[in-house]
Amino acid sequence: GIDTWGVDFGLIDKHGNLLGNPVCYRDARTEGMPAEVFKCMDEHRHYAETGIQVMPINTLFQLYSMKQNQDAQLEVARQLLFMPDLFSYFLTGVANNEYCIASTSELLNAKSRNWSFDTIHSLGLPEHLFGKIILPGTIRGTLKEDIARETGLGAVDVIAVGSHDTASAVTAVPAAESPIAFLSSGTWSLLGIEVDEPILTEEARKAQFTNEGGVDGKIRFLQNITGLW
C-alpha cells in the first residue's frame, strides 16, 4: 500500500500515459484562485457540501488555475490520479481514486463520500477526470508482470490503504477504546479528532476546520497548523 501527501496529482491520457510531471502544490499558479472560484459558487454552500477548509493549495484551485490558463494537459487528460493513486497505477495498471486522498481535494461531497459533481460542473471541469472512488482495504490490483519479474515478488496484491499520509498515521494511533485528540506533525501539523459524520456548520467553516476522510468510515475533523516547513 502507498500513502503520500495530499492534494497533488497527475493526469493520464486515453492511452494511459502520464501527461507531464505533477506540479507541487507550493507552485504560485494557485495565487488568487479562491477569489476567482467563489465568483462561480457560494463559499458557505460549498463548505456545507465538501467540508474542506479553503486553502489555495487544494486540488480544486490547481485545476481551476489550469482551466483559466487553458492548460493543454487538461484538454486531453482522461483521468486524474492523486499521488498514491498514480504510484499504484504505475505498479498495477489499474486507475482509481482512494477515498481518503480524494477528500483532500475540496472536490468530494463529505456526506455521500463521492465526487461533488455540483462543484465540478459549476467550475466547468471535465467530469470524466474523476474516476471510481474506492475505500481503504480495497485490492487495487496485482503487480504488473514485468515489475513482479524484476523484483522477484510475484503476483503481489497492491492494497488501497488510507492513502493520505495523515489518514494512515491517525489509524495507527493506539487509542481505540476512548475518544482522543491527535497531533500528526510533518510538513504541516494536523490537530484534530475522529468523528463518525462530517461537521459542516458555519461555525466550523469560520474556525477553518476541515473534514477529511479516514479509515473505517471515520472523518478526521482537524485544523492544519504550523508544521516543520
Where are these regions (language model features)?
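Gly/Ser/Thr-rich active-site cleft segment
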Residues: 46-166
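A short beta-strand-loop micro-motif that forms or neighbors metal/cofactor-
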Residues: 43
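Gly/Ser-rich phosphate-binding catalytic loop and adjacent alpha/beta segment
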Residues: 30-33, 39-40, 52-56
